[in-house]
Amino acid sequence: MCYSRQAIPPPVPNRPGGTTNRGPPPLPPRANVQPPVCSSENSSKPRENRVAGESLRTPSSSNPLADSQVNSDNIFQSPVLSNLKAPPSVFNKVQHPVPKPNIDDQSVDPLETNKFYTNMLLDDNTQPIWTHPYSIWFSRDPELFGLAANHTLASQRVFDTTTNPPRFYFNPTNIKSFVFKAREFVSSNDIKLEFRDMKHMSMCLLMSLSSSQFIEFPLVQGMGFVTAIYHDLGFELRSAVGFRSLERISVNERYGKYNIQLENNRNWILYLTSPDYSFPQDFQISLLDSNTIISSHKINGLICQLSADSVPSIDMAAGCYPVYCDLSGQTVDEHFTNYRFNYTVAGYSQSGTTLMYALPHHKAAFTPEMQEREIASSLDSTVKGLMTGYLTNSFDMQVQVPQELGFEPVALSLNKKADYSQEKLSKIREAAVQEVQLSDPQQESNIDSMYFSGKILAKYAWILYVTHYILHDENLTKELLSKLTIAMERFISNQQVLPLNYDVSWKGIISSGSSSQDFGNSYYNDHHFHYSYHVITAAIISLVDSDLSGVTNNSWLENNRDWVECLIRDYSGVDNDDPYFPQFRSFDWFNGHSWAKGLFPSGDGKDEESTSEDVNSCYAIKLWGLVTGNSKLTDIANLQLGIMRNVFQSYFLYESNNTVQPKEFIGNKVSGILFENKIDHATYFGMEPQYIHMIHAIPITSASSWVRTPNFVKEEWEEKMQPIIDQVNDGWKGIIMLNMALLDPKFSYDFFSQPDFNRNFLDNGQSLTWSLAYSGAFS
């Protein structure tokens, strides 16, 4: 069901039993020769435009930092993980029930499953994708078939009117402002869709009539133009909104520029550029009727570009378009990291650059050089504020990173490190002795869910950390280490209730359960949530085992490293040449956070329900990097965490001074489920306030203090949690109260240190030992 088309509260799928934890998902889960560098007029004669099927990878001409410096210190330079061999044989090989899309090579590269364009790969290929600021989809409407494009204004958003603040807002979808087709296309059955060069920030779509007759659409996040390149086909542009007027503004030796006014009063600019960059004066376009624009004749290689804004400076980018984005990064010092989106571009423009739009968190992180490339153009995004236009072939950014974040308890936002009195250590020891001696991690984790088993294992891993590094109790540590390693062995040998498989179709580690089990893990939902708990457990076991055995005898790590890194490669593969897993399956570098939805089509695009478990996924990678001595891995995780802090505080977690989200919505304090096209202040498992808020807090670790500021916690507590805390009598209460350690550690510690503490207040992934150790460290 596509909720975004109706101006009524979108229903939230129920999870059975009113469980206070995340339960089984609804059905279905989460419904729903080389390219030329873009040349400038002052450069030599431009090269011929590339033909489809050739590599999209060429260096960008715009590179404000020295390439030699970036490449030599590039934290993304392969190899990051030293062993990219086939997944362990314990994983059975299976074919995925979701067929692979029509791609140019059916056997070589792993396919992305959680990226902005995945919607278009599924079912009948008609679900929208969001490159931001545009939405794009394939229309099979018999009257208006082809590739449709649209941009929505903030004024078009639909807000819930039944609650204050509104529970949701969404943008209307499937408004066919423009539909690209060719005069030779008689019906949608004539069109063959082909998907090429599918990377984690870009892909290329072909609408083909034959091998020589096709329209090519490079789709790159943040692209300023919707670009179509016509190969031996006649240009035709249609609109369901309707064309009110078509005006030729100018025709020069490089391009033709036209103003198109739609019947909804929106004005768009159309640029037409010939492949030899010498625009023929006899080439004309005209209105055939109020829904159709056609050309006088065809030009093989005609570049057609639509812009939703009309500021004159956009002319400087006309004829140039991005086709691929390369990611690079460099550690500046212990506090900051630079990172760059380096766009490979094709075509020719007056400025030598293309047009790109940046989200607010990009703009906030831009280096001073980026200010010179900013133009007076801004377009609304769907759910992430106002985007700003730049004439550029790269985004150059710098963010603060949590270099000091490691295993030990810290409160980064309070600038506090652990300090325990003897009284507190005694209280922590009392809890630890009870939880270790009465525990059975092997039995507790013997369940049919990688998510819930991971939470349980990580709970005991943090107890293990406390017994060894805070209590310094070797006997207690050895007792729990033995239990925990036995529990982990079930998963490492793949003997759990629902074993994992290796999917040879899309290429990844998936559950053997059905699409409705374990939150849709078998369809690539939530992998970063699920597997990160296991990675954290492995990191802590490795750390403690190494300490007990001696630095030179870290046998547990070496014996199990391939299995752990297989999970990391699945949800956050860091090497672009890994033949078994896609790069960064879950994490979206343009949006600055992960997407939880996998191979399920959705009318509102990808979504994310838990910012805190997203943080946990990168925290897990950092901890594994620390324990294995992999500095590149820790640097990448630090960068992700640095980006996430800005992103979550802008788009997901709302302090009263938030200026990015609509002012009428920030009173919710948290997003709930954030989709690409809407925000719904809800969860997939219930509507209780503690569910909606604390799914963005769980699990509380040192990493929580990096993202959740004391002021945010204060506002959320006073406005949302304090009024209901006395009515919460289950595991969510413990999460709420440990979350308070980020604001008032003493208040939190006093709650957990009560002599008659009720353990029913602990979530199944939360221990009293860790709750006392974390809150007591700073009180």
UniProtKB/Swiss-Prot annotation:
Residue numbers spanned by region Sufficient for catalytic activity: 375-779
pH curve summary: Optimum pH is 6.5.
Domain annotation GH81: ranges: 73-779
GO molecular function: endo-1,3(4)-beta-glucanase activity; glucan endo-1,3-beta-D-glucosidase activity
Region annotation beta-sandwich subdomain: where it falls in the sequence: 73-309
Hydrolase keyword on record: yes
Annotated segments matching region Disordered: 1-71
GO terms under biological process: actin cytoskeleton organization; cell wall organization; polysaccharide catabolic process
EC number: 3.2.1.39
Catalytic activity: Hydrolysis of (1->3)-beta-D-glucosidic linkages in (1->3)-beta-D-glucans
UniProt region (May provide specificity for triple-helical beta-glucan), positions on chain: 678-680
Temperature-related activity annotation: Optimum temperature is 55 degrees Celsius.
UniProt-recorded name of the protein: Glucan endo-1,3-beta-D-glucosidase 2
Protein role: Cleaves internal linkages in 1,3-beta-glucan.
Recorded consequence of changing residue 588 to A: Abolishes enzyme activity
Localization: Cytoplasm
UniProt-annotated stretches for the region alpha/beta subdomain: 309-400
Active-site residues, as the UniProt record annotates them: 526, 609, 613
Note: Present with 1420 molecules/cell in log phase SD medium.
Gene Ontology terms: cellular component: cell surface; cytoplasm
Domain of life: Eukaryota
Stated regulation of activity: Inhibited by mercury ions.
Pfam family, one: Glyco_hydro_81
Organism the protein comes from: Saccharomyces cerevisiae (strain ATCC 204508 / S288c)
Family according to the record: Belongs to the glycosyl hydrolase 81 family.
Region ranges ((alpha/beta)6 barrel subdomain): 415-779
